[in-house]
């Protein structure tokens, strides 16, 4: 499970050093892809296979499902961390997420997310205020 917030930097070769706590789960390989709110999703290969299976069950007659799957999968990149726990983030994904050198890597349960640090701070500032007011119905049965 991915938890916490980390603030790494991209190096000059567009490589990210994965947080140490994430490396074991991602050591055998991972998939980077476009996420909502202009971040990148980071899935273990195993979790990505589950996500892909869910997508395969979507009706091909749904234009919205086809569009989502095309955008999601066409931007996906499979990576294997090097011995130092580094991965290269492709230029197209860096551009999509507006990544500069300063990043925020957050744990989001079954996945990690990579954000531009300033974008993450702005998102958190906007959403954190309403967090304590969130209705139970958002995630039924959680509390």
UniProtKB/Swiss-Prot annotation:
Cited PROSITE patterns: SPOVT_ABRB
Gene3D superfamilies on file: Transcriptional regulator MraZ domain
CDD domains the record matches: MraZ_C, MraZ_N
Signal peptide: none
Entry GO MF terms: DNA-binding transcription factor activity; transcription cis-regulatory region binding
A GO cellular component annotation in the UniProt record: nucleoid
Superkingdom: Bacteria
GO BP: negative regulation of DNA-templated transcription initiation
Cellular localisation: Cytoplasm, Nucleoid
Domain SpoVT-AbrB: 5-47, 76-119
Keywords tagged on the record: Cytoplasm, DNA-binding, Repeat, Transcription, Transcription regulation
Sequence similarity: Belongs to the MraZ family.
Record-linked HAMAP family: MraZ
PANTHER family assigned: TRANSCRIPTIONAL REGULATOR MRAZ (PTHR34701:SF1)
Subunit structure: Forms oligomers.
UniProt-recorded name of the protein: Transcriptional regulator MraZ
Record organism: Kocuria rhizophila (strain ATCC 9341 / DSM 348 / NBRC 103217 / DC2201)
Annotated gene: mraZ
